[in-house]
């Protein structure tokens, strides 16, 4: 890891209003993510882990505070500029795979590269190589409904890496994987981390996985704490 800060959030708070009552989900969060750093986020269900991922990745706006990527304030960008920044620099692995049902596994994985104006041939070549990495060589032409839940999640992992992102945001990436596939995910994560210097921010309940990352942070009562596992 080097000391280049990729993403930084400063004094970030997120609140919601329900029945005229203000609920504080995240309270004055400060965090820096460095180039090639791997971070796990743990905490109880409903503690705000996924909310933090959405804020950091520009999918949602903080109520107060500032989030910057390479010094550029994300929530001040136009919708189109923010989408461009996300597609070019961020990869996403959601708790639910969000694969498009009418497209093949190969086409799903290639989609972000096609949105990024890669040629169809180049995008599919990249997708094919990643699908080999995650053990889905024999599933490339299948529709998502024709493969298992674990295989769909592996396809989603491959999709997150296709644009060679600077940061991958992962929300319970091993939640639908068996032990063998979880180990393969970690090996792939480390391989990409070492070779591409990709940073990973991983929300997980998998303590074994959390222990293997550079550091672990815990959200508790809306605050972010460093956790020693």
Curated annotation (Swiss-Prot):
It is a peripheral membrane protein. Keywords: ATP-binding, Cell membrane, Membrane, Nucleotide-binding, Translocase, Transport. The keyword Transmembrane does not apply. It is an enzyme of class 7 (translocase). One of its GO terms (biological process) is lipoprotein localization to membrane. It is found in: Cell membrane. Residues 7-229 form the ABC transporter domain. GO terms for cellular component: plasma membrane. ATP binds at residues 43-50. PROSITE patterns: ABC_TRANSPORTER_1, ABC_TRANSPORTER_2, LOLD. One of its GO terms (molecular function) is ATP binding. It comes from the Bacteria. Disulfide bonds: none annotated. Its EC number is 7.6.2.-. Part of the ABC transporter complex LolCDE involved in the translocation of lipoproteins, in an ATP-dependent manner. The complex is composed of two ATP-binding proteins (LolD) and two transmembrane proteins (LolC and LolE). PANTHER family: ABC TRANSPORTER ATP-BINDING PROTEIN MG467-RELATED, LIPOPROTEIN-RELEASING SYSTEM ATP-BINDING PROTEIN LOLD. Belongs to the ABC transporter superfamily. Lipoprotein translocase (TC 3.A.1.125) family. This is Lipoprotein-releasing system ATP-binding protein LolD. It comes from Wigglesworthia glossinidia brevipalpis.
